[in-house]
Amino acid sequence: MVVIRLARGGSKKRPFFNIVATDSRNRRDGRFIERVGFYNPLASEGEEGLRVVADRLAYWQGVGAQLSPTVARLVKQNAAKAAA
């Protein structure tokens, strides 16, 4: 099953996450099919903290990919922020 989840990057104490479409059997930071965005929890005011390629996210959901709970929360917050 294909899932869309966070893959951790960055250095120690400086997390950075790629939002990736991957097979659920792969490791968290292992092989992935496609990178559909990123999340930087330590982004300052001038930096972009979250970027999601909406059409690719919609494509993967259309072919049956499941969002992880954290990615679903981030996408929902981003949509609310964009609408406001």
From Swiss-Prot:
Keywords of this entry: Ribonucleoprotein, Ribosomal protein
GO BP of this protein: translation
A Pfam match: Ribosomal_S16
Keyword match Ribonucleoprotein: yes
A GO cellular component entry from the record: cytoplasm
Alphabetized GO MF terms: structural constituent of ribosome
Gene3D superfamilies hit by this protein: 3.30.1320.10
InterPro entries: Ribosomal_bS16, Ribosomal_bS16_dom_sf
Family recorded in the similarity comment: Belongs to the bacterial ribosomal protein bS16 family.
HAMAP family, A to Z: Ribosomal_bS16
Protein's recorded name: Small ribosomal subunit protein bS16
Source organism of this protein record: Cupriavidus pinatubonensis (strain JMP 134 / LMG 1197) (Cupriavidus necator (strain JMP 134))
